[in-house]
Amino acid sequence: MQLEVIKSFSLSIGTKIKIDQFGLLEGSLRNRKDGITYFGYNGINSNNNIDNIEEENNLDYLLPIKHCDNPGRFFKIQYIKKLNEYILKHLEKGFGTFIKIEDSMYLRNKSIINIGDVYLAIFFSEKNSDKKDIYGFNCDLKIKVYNNNNNNKEYTFEKENEKDIKIGRSNFGNDIELNDNLISKINCVIRYNNIKGWMIKDGSDTILKNGEIKRNFSKNGTWILASDNIKITDKMIFKSNFNIFKCSLIQGWNYIL
């Protein structure tokens, strides 16, 4: 597979990072070939000042950053042999590793959503005592909003099959209104489905006069924290510490995709 840098303050746009089932193909700092590629920051900033040293042999690929209070491994890409797929996972250092939501995605208890400068924390009610019910079946939804302009508000929604919970800018009739110019009129929609549980979708749908449905994507995206192992798909986009990457699954390498 390959990562391409499509936006960054520190890496050259168009930089391509190639990974196979053993790890980073070229220039690995760890050089372990264990199927895992660790991306992160070693604590030495662009001015060669030390923030907090993290040994380079813990990393495969170094992400240059001007300053970071918690250097170390930001995220990993790992090849899972028995599933013949790659996964992405945030490793709790840096400023978070977020996947861009292109289609509907499942929400899990304690999911973190980023839109504009706002963060939404997702929690399910405790009506169902089954701890394995991480997708919130038969549970109501609580959303906590974290942003300087929105005063950490909380919202609670009862499960109601196929009813849209609209999240977007203020004064546009949304269920959650956010005062942030980086956010679209309707930035994303959350919906409960009796079969799938709680789902989130970027943008909104408009029904045209001819009955067709037009998809309206948000301007700056809806992003979900990769707090669990997320299967990497072709053309998937994710961001980590002011870098945005596009994934490509390349046919014809020494493994089958």
Residues covered by each model-derived region:
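Forkhead-associated
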Residues: 21-109, 157-241
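Regulatory inter-domain linker segments that are low-complexity and enriched
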Residues: 1-15, 20-21, 27, 118-197, ...
